[in-house]
């Protein structure tokens, strides 16, 4: 049957995990299908939504190759299931409570570059040797750089190897905690979170909202760690920079390994875009890919959103995806920050965060804190604005462009040798760009 051939070909392009857990569960609805409308039936809403979102277009492309006609792919949910057979029960669901795990987030699907290589290797080793190395593992970096992908890659790997995995956001942990306190069912809460092999907490920085939650997580952390269970957390900043956290909790975050993810370089962004296009069966020319990589920001989710929007508009309007078409579709998403960010905005933000006067930055003061703030401003100004070296020299009261270059070089040297300083500069950059 043609549908079987298509599914078999799809299986050659995706991971074994996804094939077994999702694609193998759908059935071709021959009675309701025709050459232009292909219908598959899935056993539940989870599988339906996942396949419709991730694979419908790829399945349609394979049908087009086989028949010359690109059909509309529909995934419907099987209804009126009277009984559940033993073989229908997914053991992984039993082992994964309150799980956010997305099976497409694997180590194999993660695009590695200089900006994330250390975090990637650390995550792999923590997954392969849970509780034995890098425990806890603390992954930090700005929004949309791949922290959640690595966190869930660890979860999916450990799940495949028979471990009990809990994967939740900090908000979910807090909500679960509050609900169990109100219901007086804390024994149930403790049994759930303290008896797992792997505890994964995404965006742990939001624990600052609740001292009671921090207290509970402190004891949860201690018990899991004592039992040699693996703990992995993600955050937008390193432990030392977390505000509103107890020192004893921050110190535990530093017990193991801290791995940062920085904004991807152009080459990595290009490879990420190509991987996304291949995964979703989207055909973009090299000039479009380079345009997206060069002009979008560093947030990978925003880049992927741009790709999805381009493809969706092309399908709806039945147009060929050209560079001009792509530019028009994502023009509102493009991060044209350089023309919008002023030098005064940078000085204002840096001086506020470093608790000095804006006038001090332009002064001749050689006080250590002021010199550092001035250098950070110059570094960010060169990174975020179109101003030339001579223009920056004039604005900051420096002798000439070589003095600007010297200040930028000093900041780069510190960034390369001090992870904490690097995170501070990155946080300042994010605050400046997010205000625009």
Curated annotation (Swiss-Prot):
GO molecular function, one term: ATP binding
Binding site for ATP: 144, 146-148
Record region (Domain IV, binds dsDNA): 315-436
Ranges for region Domain II: 69-99
Location of the region described as Domain III, AAA+ region in the Swiss-Prot/TrEMBL record: 100-314
HAMAP family listed in its UniProt record: DnaA_bact
Its biological purpose: Plays an essential role in the initiation and regulation of chromosomal replication. ATP-DnaA binds to the origin of replication (oriC) to initiate formation of the DNA replication initiation complex once per cell cycle. Binds the DnaA box (a 9 base pair repeat at the origin) and separates the double-stranded (ds)DNA. Forms a right-handed helical filament on oriC DNA; dsDNA binds to the exterior of the filament while single-stranded (ss)DNA is stabiized in the filament's interior.
Domain notes: Domain I is involved in oligomerization and binding regulators, domain II is flexibile and of varying length in different bacteria, domain III forms the AAA+ region, while domain IV binds dsDNA.
Quaternary structure and interacting proteins, as annotated: Oligomerizes as a right-handed, spiral filament on DNA at oriC.
Identification of the protein by name: Chromosomal replication initiator protein DnaA
The species this protein was found in: Campylobacter fetus subsp. fetus (strain 82-40)
Gene this protein is translated from: dnaA
């Amino acid at each position: 049957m043609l549908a079987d051939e298509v599914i078999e070909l799809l299986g050659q392009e995706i991971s074994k995990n996804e094939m077994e857990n999702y694609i193998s569960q759908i059935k071709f609805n021959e009675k309701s299908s025709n050459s232009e409308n292909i219908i598959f039936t899935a056993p539940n809403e989870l599988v339906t939504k996942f396949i419709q979102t991730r694979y419908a277009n790829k399945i349609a492309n394979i049908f087009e190759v086989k028949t010359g006609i690109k059909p509309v792919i529909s995934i419907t949910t099987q209804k009126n299931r009277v009984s559940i057979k033993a073989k229908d029960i997914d053991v992984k669901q039993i082992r994964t409570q309150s799980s956010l795990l997305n099976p497409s987030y694997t180590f194999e699907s993660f695009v590695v570059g200089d900006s994330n290589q250390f975090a990637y290797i650390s995550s792999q080793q923590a997954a392969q040797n849970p509780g034995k190395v890098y425990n806890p593992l603390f992954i930090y970096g700005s929004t949309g750089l791949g922290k959640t992908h690595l966190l869930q890659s660890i979860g999916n790997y450990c799940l495949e190897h028979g471990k009990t995995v809990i994967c939740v956001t900090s908000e979910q942990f807090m909500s679960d905690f509050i609900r169990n306190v109100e219901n007086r069912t804390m024994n149930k809460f403790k049994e759930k979170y303290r008896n797992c092999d792997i505890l994964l907490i995404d965006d742990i920085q939001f624990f600052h909202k609740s001292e009671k939650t921090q207290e509970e997580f402190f004891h949860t952390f201690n018990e899991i760690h004592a039992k040699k269970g693996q703990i992995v957390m993600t955050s937008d900043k390193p432990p030392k920079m977390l505000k509103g956290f107890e020192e004893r909790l921050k110190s535990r975050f530093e017990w193991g390994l801290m791995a940062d993810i920085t904004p991807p370089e152009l080459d990595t962004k290009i490879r990420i875009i190509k991987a996304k296009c291949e995964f979703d069966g989207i055909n973009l020319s090299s000039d479009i890919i380079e345009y997206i990589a060069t002009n979008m920001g560093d947030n990978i989710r925003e880049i992927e959103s741009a790709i999805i929007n381009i493809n969706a508009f092309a399908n709806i309007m039945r147009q060929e995806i050209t560079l001009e078409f792509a530019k028009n579709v994502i023009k509102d998403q493009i991060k044209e920050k350089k023309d919008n960010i002023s030098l005064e905005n940078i000085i204002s933000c840096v001086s506020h965060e470093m608790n000095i006067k804006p006038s001090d930055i332009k002064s001749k003061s050689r006080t250590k804190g002021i010199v550092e703030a001035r250098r950070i401003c110059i570094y960010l100004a060169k990174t975020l604005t179109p101003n030339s070296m001579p223009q920056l020299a004039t604005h900051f009261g420096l002798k000439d462009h070589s003095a600007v270059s010297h200040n930028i070089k000093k900041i780069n040297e510190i960034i390369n040798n001090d992870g904490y300083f690097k995170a501070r500069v990155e946080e300042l950059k994010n605050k400046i760009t997010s205000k625009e």
